[in-house]
């Protein structure tokens, strides 16, 4: 069970230098996005049984349901008659790195009444991103879902999602809310905000005080995998000709979770991280965050 943001992504990659105050040739693409929706799509595409809950504008609710269904996700989307679907304009640099301009729109209006009855009845895992903890209305939903998951004995997985949003909230509060989650997937910047360390191995080790499995994503430097009581393990990135890094971390998370959901406690964690790195490397070679 995944709950969180759904967005309309607009990807903009200038061709050559930017001409301030005038026209700049660019490659522009519109794609479905949203961190939680992307992660759900990759989990389902790679074999997991996934239900997703979120809120979108009524005008394109059918489009987003169809896009998620295309990857195998059972989409429970509330259609908001008064707000647009969240939108992100993503400026892609020549090296594939991104700068994002975000209007979360209908995502910010998600509420408990949008969750269908019995949504967690058949779930084994609840997966949330940090975006669901960033605003008071959403935080209420996130904390309620976490309480329900814990009372039912469900595992929880967390992707902190955004260093900028984490910096606006209290990192200590986020750690407290998500304490005991089975898996956490911060990137380097998010991990640094959460634990105040600069070294990725130290970040990962510190985070195992709160989570059972920690995977610190390092982009082209791969990732660090850590579990309590054992030295962190470095997993290298797969080489790739990067055109657009949008969704690479989401694909990594979804791929790792697909292996963990399939194999449970028997999961070969380094092999799962290596598989996730391979999937993420495929994503950066093209535009868009979802499976083709």
Residue ranges: model-predicted function:
Residues 43, 187, 249:
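Short, conserved phosphate/pyrophosphate- and ester-handling motifs at nucleotide-, phospho-/glycolipid
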Residues 20-22, 45-128:
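Conserved N-terminal subdomain of the carbohydrate kinase-like
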Residues 125-202, 221-223:
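Conserved beta-alpha-beta core of the PfkB/ribokinase-like small-molecule kinase fold
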Residues 50, 75, 156-157, 214:
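Hydrophobic beta-strand scaffold residues
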């Amino acid at each position: 069970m995944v709950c969180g943001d759904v967005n309309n992504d607009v990807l903009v990659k200038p061709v050559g230098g930017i001409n301030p105050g005038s026209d700049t040739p660019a490659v522009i693409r519109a794609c479905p996005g949203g961190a939680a929706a992307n992660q759900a799509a990759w989990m389902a595409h790679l074999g997991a049984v996934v239900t997703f809950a979120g809120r979108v504008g009524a005008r394109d609710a059918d489009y987003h349901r169809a896009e998620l269904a295309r990857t195998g996700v059972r989409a429970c989307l509330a259609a908001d008659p008064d707000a647009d679907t969240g939108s992100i304009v993503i400026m892609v640099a020549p090296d594939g790195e991104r700068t994002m301009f975000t209007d979360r729109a209908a995502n910010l209006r998600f509420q408990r009444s949008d969750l269908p009855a019995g949504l967690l009845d058949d779930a084994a895992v609840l997966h949330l991103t940090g975006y669901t903890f960033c605003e008071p209305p959403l935080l209420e939903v996130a904390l309620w879902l976490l309480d329900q998951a814990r009372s039912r004995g469900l595992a929880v997985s967390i992707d902190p999602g955004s260093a900028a949003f984490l910096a606006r909230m209290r990192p200590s509060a986020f750690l407290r809310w998500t304490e005991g989650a089975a898996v956490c997937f911060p990137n380097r910047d998010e991990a640094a905000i959460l634990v105040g360390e600069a070294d990725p191995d130290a970040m990962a080790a510190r985070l195992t005080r709160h989570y059972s499995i920690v995977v610190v994503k390092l982009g082209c430097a791969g990732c660090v995998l850590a579990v309590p009581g054992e030295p962190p393990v470095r997993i290298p990135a797969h080489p790739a000709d990067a055109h657009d890094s949008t969704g690479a971390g989401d694909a990594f998370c979804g791929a790792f979770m697909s292996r963990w959901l399939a194999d449970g406690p028997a999961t070969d964690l380094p092999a799962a991280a290596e598989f996730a790195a391979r999937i993420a490397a495929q994503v950066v070679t093209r535009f868009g965050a979802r499976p083709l």
